[in-house]
Amino acid sequence: MDLKVVAVSFLLLVLCSEAAGYQLLTWEQANTAVKGVLDKVHSTGVEKLRDIYDKSVDAVGTYTSILTDQLYHWWCGEQ
């Protein structure tokens, strides 16, 4: 619930800060401003998730290779 309040407050801040004088922005201008902010936020979130995914895949790949090597030497022994 707190996240919704923060998001609505942020959107209102963006809309009000883009007002010129006493005139409010038209719907199209407001829509464009909000979409720009949301794209920036979305891109940052996606990049963070992609970075976490890449790091975890690298770690799992390393340990899988080590485990595979150990199982191979345990099963086949030294020949």
Swiss-Prot record:
GO molecular function: phospholipase activator activity; phospholipase binding
Lipid binding as annotated region, ranges: 45-52
Subcellular location: Secreted
Principal localisation: secreted
InterPro entries according to UniProt: Apo-CII, ApoC-II_dom_sf
Residues in the signal sequence: 1-21
Stretch list, region Lipoprotein lipase cofactor: 56-79
Record's comment on post-translational modification: Proapolipoprotein C-II is synthesized as a sialic acid containing glycoprotein which is subsequently desialylated prior to its proteolytic processing. Proapolipoprotein C-II, the major form found in plasma undergoes proteolytic cleavage of its N-terminal hexapeptide to generate apolipoprotein C-II, which occurs as the minor form in plasma.
Gene3D superfamilies associated with the record: Apolipoprotein C-II (1.10.1440.10)
A Gene Ontology BP annotation from the UniProt entry: lipid transport
Keywords: Chylomicron, Glycoprotein, HDL, LDL, Lipid degradation, Lipid metabolism, Lipid transport, Secreted, Sialic acid, Signal, Transport, VLDL
Any one GO cellular component localisation term in the record: high-density lipoprotein particle
Pfam families from the UniProt entry: Apo-CII
Functional description taken from the UniProt entry: Component of chylomicrons, very low-density lipoproteins (VLDL), low-density lipoproteins (LDL), and high-density lipoproteins (HDL) in plasma. Plays an important role in lipoprotein metabolism as an activator of lipoprotein lipase. Both proapolipoprotein C-II and apolipoprotein C-II can activate lipoprotein lipase.
Protein family membership: Belongs to the apolipoprotein C2 family.
Protein name: Apolipoprotein C-II
Species of the source: Alligator mississippiensis
